[in-house]
Amino acid sequence: LSSLAGDCFVIHEAVQGDYGAQRPDGFVHYTAGAWPIGPAEVTAFSAGPLPDIGLPQARIVTGDAFVECPDHSLRLRDGLAGDLVDMETGAVAQVATRLGLPWSAIKATTDDANGESVSDFDANLLVASFRAAQAAEQAIRLM
């Protein structure tokens, strides 16, 4: 899924991967919440700091579609300098930023955004949830 090793990450930045403008020469990304016209620019939503809990940091690309295609995952990650893709983090980051609230995220992966994603998600959801909860508890203890 990415060049980062592991299955649980501290998210340091989030971008929306499906917000922008569809043009004749392809899709153009914009910062979520900005008008999708004029020169394209994507500014990541920066997470607040978490204590060091020994997890790698990642930039996540969020979209509204469940990704079951490794080529699409790669296009999103390469096009937006992301390490991971998901459906939640960027939306939370955007709303928090709009409201002037700090946000932080820990992401445990459930699948590799490929043809096996549906069965992988079902099989791995409980383990990933537990892993993320453990990491969050550790971070809170260190705050």
Predicted regions and their residues:
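Regulatory input/activation interfaces that engage signals or partners
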Residues: W103, A108-M143
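A C-terminal functional module that forms or caps the active site or interfaces directly
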Residues: F66-V118
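Mid-sequence, gly/pro-rich, charge-dense loop/helix-turn segments that line enzyme active sites
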Residues: L1-L80
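Alpha-helical scaffold segments in soluble metabolic enzymes
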Residues: R59, R75, A91, R131-Q138
